[in-house]
């Protein structure tokens, strides 16, 4: 399980050190793809295979299913940790998430997320005000 928030930097070659606490859970190879809310999702290969199976089962006749799977899979790339624990983030993914120098890496249960520091801070500020309301709405999900 992934949890926590870590501040990291991206170098001029698009490389970022993956937090040490996340490396074992991700494994030497994992998948990075476009996420929601203008961040990137990172999945261990075992989790990626489960998601892939679920998405392959979506009906091709549904426009939203086609659009989502296209967007999600076309942005996906396999990442491999180097000896320093770094990954090279593909340029299209850097552009999508507006990642430049400062990056926030968070753990969200079965995945990690990479956020632009500026976008993450704005997101947190917006969510703090409505967190109690969101929690109340989640009661129906047996949490």
UniProtKB/Swiss-Prot annotation:
A Pfam family found in this protein is MraZ
Keyword rRNA-binding (UniProt): no
What keywords were assigned to this record?
Cytoplasm, DNA-binding, Repeat, Transcription, Transcription regulation
Repeat is among the record's keywords: yes
Q: Which GO terms describe its molecular function?
A: DNA-binding transcription factor activity; transcription cis-regulatory region binding
Where does it reside? Cytoplasm, Nucleoid
Cross-referenced SUPFAM superfamilies, in alphabetical order? AbrB/MazE/MraZ-like (SSF89447)
Task: List residues of the SpoVT-AbrB domain.
Answer: 5-47, 76-119
Q: Where is the signal peptide?
A: none
Assembly behavior: Forms oligomers.
NCBIfam families, alphabetically?
division/cell wall cluster transcriptional repressor MraZ (TIGR00242)
Name of the molecule in the record:
Transcriptional regulator MraZ
Tell me the organism. Answer: Bacillus licheniformis (strain ATCC 14580 / DSM 13 / JCM 2505 / CCUG 7422 / NBRC 12200 / NCIMB 9375 / NCTC 10341 / NRRL NRS-1264 / Gibson 46)
